């Protein structure tokens, strides 16, 4: 797995830090260049950075820094897909760093079986980024704190990060030098953007006839967004119900 070099901190890098979603970045942006770019998004919104990693370098270089792409690590994923997504995360981050971008590795994990590879490619003492959003209770999703804290504590043990950027409210049990980034202040709601997506960007995620609104789908696509259970740790499909 490629190694993302340690982030070289500059004065003010983490002062009043806000993030901007990759899908809201553009070359003409003059108002949000002091933010770091995050990929805590549905995977289809940034799949292109894996397919064409050079295309967005000029744009990304204008921002304060870039978090490595957070390709999803759902518990329901096959292990080979989890490993593949860790590889893609680190490869993009390492490649961008080699091109002069300031990159902070995003860390995600599945269950304990992923711990042997999901922290690879990150040097000890690095600055890292995590998000509690998908592990927190909201909308139809249940709390997944137990899953999150198991991986978080293992990350502390293996990486010993210098700083941890936490997108969304940290859990009280989280230890370490945490830099809390407010989810709402960083969201598109405060940036006068409209939600949009291109249907052609979803081709890789098409799964056929899916009708449930209780998992991360846009009919008829299964789309990743982070980690934990794709079913929000609560609702699960009825195995007796015909597809």
List the model feature ranges, each with a label:
Residues 41-45, 169-170, 210-211, 226:
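Short, flexible beta-strand-to-coil junctions
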Residues 28, 37, 47-197:
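Eukaryote-skewed repeat-based solenoidal scaffolds used as protein-protein interaction platforms
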Residues 11, 18, 99, 156, ...:
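Generic alpha-helical secondary structure signal
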Residues 1-57, 77, 158, 193, ...:
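Non-catalytic, usually N-terminal nucleic-acid engagement modules in DNA/RNA processing proteins
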């Amino acid at each position: 797995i490629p190694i993302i070099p340690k982030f070289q901190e500059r004065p003010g890098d983490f002062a009043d830090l806000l993030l901007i979603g990759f899908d809201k970045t553009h070359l003409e942006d003059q108002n949000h260049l002091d933010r770091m770019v995050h990929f805590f998004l549905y995977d289809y919104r940034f799949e292109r950075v894996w397919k064409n990693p050079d295309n967005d370098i000029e744009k990304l270089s204008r921002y304060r820094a870039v978090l490595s792409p957070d390709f999803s690590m759902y518990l329901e994923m096959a292990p080979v897909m989890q490993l593949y997504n860790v590889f893609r995360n680190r490869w993009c981050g390492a490649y961008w760093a080699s091109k002069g971008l300031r990159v902070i590795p995003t860390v995600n994990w599945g269950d304990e079986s992923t711990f042997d590879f999901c922290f690879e490619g990150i040097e000890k003492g690095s600055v890292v980024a995590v998000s509690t959003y998908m592990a927190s209770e909201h909308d139809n999703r249940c709390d997944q704190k137990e899953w999150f804290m198991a991986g978080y504590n293992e990350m502390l043990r293996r990486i010993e990060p210098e700083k941890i950027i936490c997108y969304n409210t940290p859990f009280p049990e989280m230890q370490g030098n945490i830099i809390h980034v407010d989810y709402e202040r960083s969201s598109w709601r405060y940036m006068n953007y409209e939600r949009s997506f291109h249907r052609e960007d979803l081709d890789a995620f098409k799964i056929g006839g899916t009708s449930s609104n209780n998992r991360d789908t846009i009919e008829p696509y299964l789309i990743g967004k982070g980690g934990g259970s794709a079913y929000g740790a609560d609702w699960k499909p009825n195995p007796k119900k015909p597809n």
